[in-house]
Amino acid sequence: MSQKTVLITGISRGIGRACALAFAKAGYAVAGCCHTRSDLLDTLSAELTALGTPHLLLQGELQNSAFPTSLIEQTVARFGHLDVLINNAGVSMIRMLTDTDDSQWEHVISSNLSSAFYCSRAAIPYFLKNREREDISPQAPYGVIINVSSVWGCSGASCEVAYSASKAGLNGLTVALAKELAPSNIAVNALACGVIDTDMNRCFSDEERAALAEEIPMGRFATPEETAEALLLLSRMPAYLTGQVIRFDGGFL
């Protein structure tokens, strides 16, 4: 059986970094990208090298189609195939709608939604080519797309209209694309995360973090590492599990 390959966007820190290490320890070749933090890519590369994991880490912009297409092409050229795509890259923004200008709105939508569209579109032809492989069992998908979404895409959040809209759109993309690709044995799901203890949520004060934790039945934020374990588990599900937006929120909703 050939080594499986995962591609993770937003790989330099938080959930993406934890995913890279979890999939590496599970025996995958790892490809990924980040937008600006090449120093963090270097650090991650050293960790993957220490694990003996083949990897390809690139810096680029996912908000138009050129780099996502190149990223997928380079991944397949390096490793021969692609098995799992995790659309994890994204940004948050806390701001009243009336204080949100056009460029801020477009930045959030393109970062959180358009990037997943571009990467998924580029990956699908290579997933279809996996039908020719003999090392994929009949119940296993020819490809897996997992979109890292948010509970705010399900319920909405005050002062986070752009973010909530982008994640709601990502949930819609997940369900619609799953129906489109199911006849081709390609699975598409989303993990709708609650509050994860990453840099994205470091904007909250200690008092705000404590108040938010009190609203979560588990009484705490999730770690990036346990989120990565959930994504790894989801990537290994039979192809029949598709079109689902699975909440990972400690019972928050």
List each model region and its residues.
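Conserved glycine-rich Rossmann-like NAD(P)H-binding loop of the short-chain dehydrogenase/reductase
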Residues: A26-D42
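Substrate-binding pocket helix/loop in short-chain dehydrogenase/reductase
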Residues: M96-L97, D101-I109, E208, L212
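Alpha-helical segment proximal to the catalytic Tyr-Lys
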Residues: P125, K179-P183
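Residue(s) in the substrate-gating loop at a strand-loop-helix junction
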Residues: S150
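Short, small/polar-rich loop/turn modules that mediate ligand/substrate recognition or access, typified
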Residues: A182-A187, L241-G243
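C-terminal substrate-recognition "lid" of short-chain dehydrogenase/reductases
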Residues: R220-F248
